[in-house]
């Protein structure tokens, strides 16, 4: 069995199931099977889905550095799945807030989005992630052409906005937001350094060609 066959029939189903475990845990906790949601179940669900949404954004952002460092190009075959799971958990986070916390009170929802800054930036991250999820298919990629790549660069903004949203929401203990912020800085910093080295190498090679000519 070659690598591509293993990925398609073994590793992709395994990764899909692993990505689904946090959602299954939330269902189990809601029914008291795997635990409980505590005194404030709505807040517990919001935190659970929001945290996992942010984690999957960071995991998706880690795919490119892992590929470049290890040389294992096959890891990119999981990037779309990881990105869609990031959207799934952020969507669940949003729906819990919309349906259970706000009870679909449109005026209260609008007031929160426009008057509470941490919700404003969280909603902006959700909209960007929604646009990327809606255009994640191969057909949309062909249809949008170069604009597809430009749109999907928004994942960097999503990461920044999501960490900012979480940091602003936490009132006392910022340990977790600080961990996520550090990981995001590492992931984005790696890209900046890698891009700078790539540009530097190209200039160096161009200079060498001019000298030899």
For the regions a protein language model found, what residue spans apply to each?
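Membrane-embedded alpha-helical bundles that constitute the cytochrome b-like, heme-associated redox core
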Residues: 1-213
């Amino acid at each position: 069995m070659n690598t591509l066959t293993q990925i398609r029939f073994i590793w992709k189903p395994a990764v899909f199931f692993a990505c689904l475990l946090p959602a299954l845990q939330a269902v189990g906790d809601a029914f008291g099977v795997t635990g409980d949601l505590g005194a404030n179940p709505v807040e517990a669900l919001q935190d659970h889905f929001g945290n996992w949404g942010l984690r999957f954004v960071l995991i998706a952002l880690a795919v490119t550095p892992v590929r470049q460092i290890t040389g294992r190009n096959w890891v990119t075959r999981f990037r779309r799945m990881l990105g869609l799971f990031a959207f799934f958990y952020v969507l669940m986070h949003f729906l819990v807030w919309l349906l259970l916390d706000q009870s679909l009170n449109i005026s209260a929802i609008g007031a929160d989005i426009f008057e509470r800054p941490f919700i404003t930036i969280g909603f902006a991250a959700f909209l960007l992630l929604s646009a990327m999820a809606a255009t994640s298919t191969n057909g949309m990629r062909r249809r949008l052409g170069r604009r597809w790549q430009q749109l999907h660069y928004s994942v960097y903004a999503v990461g920044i906005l999501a960490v900012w949203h979480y940091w602003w929401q936490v009132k006392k203990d910022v340990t977790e937001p600080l961990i996520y912020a550090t990981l995001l800085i590492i992931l984005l910093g790696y890209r900046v350094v890698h891009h700078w080295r790539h540009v530097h190498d190209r200039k160096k090679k161009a200079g060498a060609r001019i000298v030899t000519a």
